[in-house]
Amino acid sequence: MESFDVVFPLNFGLPAALPANRAIAEAALRASRTQNIPVFYAPLGIFELGDYPPRICADFNGYISTVKQVRALVETARQRAWRRVLIIAAPPHRWRALRDVRAAGFEAEVDDSLRALPRGLWYARESEHRQTTSWFRWWFTWELPARLMIYACRQCYERRASR
């Protein structure tokens, strides 16, 4: 897929000032400028994009999960007739991000530009999302259990991630 309707960055931990989220935001801006398409993200404040004009935001309350972000994308995409999504996600998050966006009915690809960054960039002790504070916590307390849940019961995964 060469052309897309929207760039969809997904955070990796909180706050927006984490090195991981700054790298994701920069990649989203580059992709938006290169493709001449808008950036969509949710919730508000998850990324610092300055006053970059072709951006669209949605908001929701509570825990920030990939499932909630994809649901916000679905709602906005219906209004704007978006079908093709370029995902910007941290390499450890790529598989599930792509799976969740495709499961919502989109044609999607993940931008490869972030794969060249060092693995240590993605994990930060100061992250408000405990699972992104270390490689071990991400894989063994979060990502692998999430993948098992997806395979065992997709609806269970979505229900849990929607809280």
Predicted feature locations:
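Glycine-rich flexible loop motifs, especially short His-Gly-Gly/GGXG/HXGH segments used as catalytic or interaction
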Residues: 125-163
